[in-house]
A protein has these predicted regions:
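N-terminal secretory signal peptides that target proteins for export/translocation
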Residues: 1-8
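Bacterial N-terminal signal peptides
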Residues: 12-24
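Sec/Tat signal peptide C-region and signal peptidase I cleavage site
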Residues: 24-31
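Flexible, processing/modification-adjacent segments and terminal tails
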Residues: 32-43, 71, 75, 110, ...
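N-terminal mature ectodomain segment of secretory-pathway/periplasmic proteins
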Residues: 35-120
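Intrinsically disordered, low-complexity boundary segments flanking structured domains
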Residues: 43-52, 150-155, 207-210, 234-235
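A short, polar/proline- and glycine-enriched secondary-structure boundary/capping micro-motif
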Residues: 70, 102-106, 115, 123-125, ...
Length: 261
């Protein structure tokens, strides 16, 4: 028997056994309610308000992008990332992985996207606040820094805007941290979030499922090493071109990087 098929059958058997054993346990996962469960919204807003109140913080994350081939087979690409924020108007993010190597710098006046691999960068004037700049980058430049959904001061409003239902899944442990898992649905995207229990309701895991894309690929972010008491200098957010770096327009950044390969 093919080893992968054998392994898959063993997984199914283990899951079936676990379901039988847990039949007498208290139910953690409940039937999905119509609309958004008030408790799920309360937990999400508590997280959002807590993060909005952190003036400076840093984090490390592992993101996984799932790609569906025309054959239906799925591939995953991993990208470790670091992120530093100083409210109300500074951001530095670096994502380096299997298919990307990008740095984002926002110093309150300008936004810069840098590709260290090809030594290319693009710079443009930016709005005066982080929230406005995140919208500007997404809507005008079609660029998104890692985990930006969580950085808005009104993150909960942004995340719930397109959601039609949501509920509390139950307790879960993420990276050794006790969390509560929430699940939400929208017309085009389903998403889940794991929020740390206790007096620091930090997001620890985030999954987006694209339902309108063939194969329903997922994007997963596992967040670790939070420092909500970080002391960051302005130098952290200032971009200084490396020797020989080539300045180009934002619209040409991806094309130039592809041409250099």
């Amino acid at each position: 028997m093919n080893h992968l098929n054998c392994f898959a059958r063993r997984i199914v058997s283990v899951i079936a056994l676990a379901m039988m054993v847990s039949a007498g346990w208290p139910q953690v996962i409940h039937a999905q309610p119509a609309g958004i469960d008030p408790q799920a919204e309360k937990l999400l807003r508590r997280m959002s308000e807590y993060l909005a109140g952190r003036q400076q913080f840093t984090l490390k994350a592992e993101s996984t992008l799932e790609v569906v081939l025309t054959s239906g087979q799925k591939l995953q690409y991993d990208s470790p990332a670091t992120l530093s924020v100083s409210r109300p108007n500074k951001l530095h993010a670096h994502r380096k992985g299997d298919i990307t190597n990008q740095e984002f710098f926002y110093d309150g006046k300008t936004l810069t996207l840098y590709n260290p691999r090809e030594n290319l960068y693009a710079t443009t004037a930016a709005p005066a606040t982080l929230d406005e700049t995140l919208d500007f980058a997404r809507e005008k430049l079609d660029i998104i820094a890692p985990a930006t959904e969580l950085l808005y001061k009104n993150a909960a409003d942004k995340m719930l805007k397109e959601s039609t239902s949501g509920f509390v899944v139950g307790p879960s442990v993420v990276g050794g941290v006790k969390t509560t898992q929430l699940a939400f649905r929208g017309a085009e995207v389903d998403w889940q979030i794991w929020i740390e229990d206790g007096d620091k309701p930090l997001p620890r895991k985030f999954i987006l499922t694209s339902k309108k894309v063939s194969g329903e690929p997922e994007f997963t972010v596992l967040i670790r090493n939070w420092d909500v008491a970080a002391k960051l200098s302005d130098q952290e957010f200032n971009f200084k071109p490396a020797k020989g770096a080539k300045k180009i327009d934002f619209l040409n950044l991806s094309a130039e990087a592809a041409k250099a390969k």
